C-alpha cells in the first residue's frame, strides 16, 4: 500500500546575498514576517474560490546548482513528494537555468510547480518571455520565470492582459492542484461564520433594523435593506 501524503509544502529558496530581498518577497506574497525560522507551519492560502492550509519552508544557499544536487538525491525523495511548489529567488543570468532545470525537473514531483523569481534589475520582460516559451512544454510541471524587482515594482500585466510579477505567482498558486490536501470551498468557508450570537443581541438587532426600516421612505431601498438584514441575521439563527 502506497501512502498518499498531502502535498502541502511551499519552499522559498534564495541565493541572493542580501537577506532583505527574501524577507520582502515573503511579506509581499505570503504576508509572512517569520523569516528568522526555516519552517512556518499552518499557513493559509485563501482566495474567492477556496482555502487551504500549507507549511512554508524558507531556506538560503550560496549556489542553487549545489543545492539542487543535494535536493535530487534519493534521500530527499520524501521531501520532494510533499512539495506543492518551489520558488527560487535568484539572478537568472547567474543561475543559468538551462543547465539547472533539466536535472532538477527530472527529480521533482510531476505536480510540483516551480517558479524562478528573477531579481536582476537589468533583465527585461522580453527575456523572461523567451525563457517561458522555451520551457513551457519541456515538462508536465508548471515551470515559470517571473520578474520580481523590489526597487521598481513590476507591471502587473502585459498588453494581452496576462499577469506578471507577483500577481502571476499568486495566480500560479491559486490554480495549483493541491494534491491530497483538504481544500475548503469558498461556500463552506461562508457557512463557517460564527453563529453564536447571544439571543439578546439578536433581538436588539431586530429592533434596530425594524426602526431603520420604518424610517426609509423609498420602498425599493426599504425592501433591499430588509433583505440584507434577513441574510445577515440568518447566519446566526
From Swiss-Prot:
The lineage of its organism: Eukaryota, Fungi, Dikarya, Ascomycota, Saccharomycotina. Keywords: Chromosomal rearrangement. Belongs to the IRC6 family. Involved in gross chromosomal rearrangements (GCRs) and telomere healing. The keyword Ligase does not apply. GO terms for biological process: vesicle-mediated transport. Disruption phenotype: Displays increased levels of spontaneous RAD52 foci in proliferating diploid cells. InterPro entries: Irc6 (IPR034627). GO terms for molecular function: protein-macromolecule adaptor activity. This is Increased recombination centers protein 6. It comes from the Eukaryota. The keyword Transmembrane does not apply.
Amino acid at each position: 500500500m502506497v501512502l498518499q501524503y498531502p502535498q502541502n509544502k511551499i519552499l522559498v529558496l534564495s541565493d541572493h546575498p542580501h537577506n532583505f530581498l527574501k524577507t520582502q518577497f515573503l511579506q509581499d506574497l505570503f504576508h509572512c514576517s517569520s523569516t528568522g525560522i526555516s519552517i512556518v507551519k499552518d499557513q493559509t492560502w485563501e482566495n474567492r474560490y477556496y482555502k487551504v492550509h500549507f507549511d512554508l519552508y524558507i531556506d538560503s544557499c550560496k549556489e542553487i546548482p549545489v543545492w539542487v544536487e543535494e535536493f535530487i538525491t534519493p534521500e530527499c525523495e520524501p521531501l520532494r513528494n510533499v512539495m506543492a511548489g518551489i520558488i527560487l529567488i535568484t539572478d537568472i543570468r547567474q543561475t543559468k537555468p538551462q543547465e539547472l532545470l533539466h536535472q532538477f525537473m527530472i527529480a521533482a514531483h510531476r505536480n510540483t510547480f516551480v517558479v524562478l523569481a528573477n531579481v536582476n534589475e537589468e533583465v527585461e520582460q522580453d527575456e523572461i518571455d523567451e525563457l517561458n516559451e522555451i520551457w513551457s512544454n519541456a515538462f508536465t510541471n508548471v515551470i515559470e520565470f517571473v520578474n520580481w524587482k523590489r526597487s521598481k515594482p513590476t507591471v502587473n500585466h502585459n498588453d494581452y492582459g496576462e499577469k506578471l510579477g507577483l500577481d502571476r505567482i499568486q495566480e500560479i498558486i491559486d490554480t495549483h492542484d493541491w494534491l491530497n490536501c483538504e481544500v475548503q470551498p469558498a461556500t463552506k468557508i461562508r457557512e463557517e461564520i460564527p453563529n453564536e450570537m447571544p439571543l439578546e443581541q439578536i433581538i436588539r438587532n431586530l429592533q434596530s433594523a425594524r426602526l431603520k426600516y420604518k424610517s426609509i421612505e423609498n420602498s425599493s431601498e426599504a425592501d433591499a435593506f430588509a433583505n440584507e438584514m434577513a441574510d445577515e441575521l440568518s447566519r446566526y439563527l
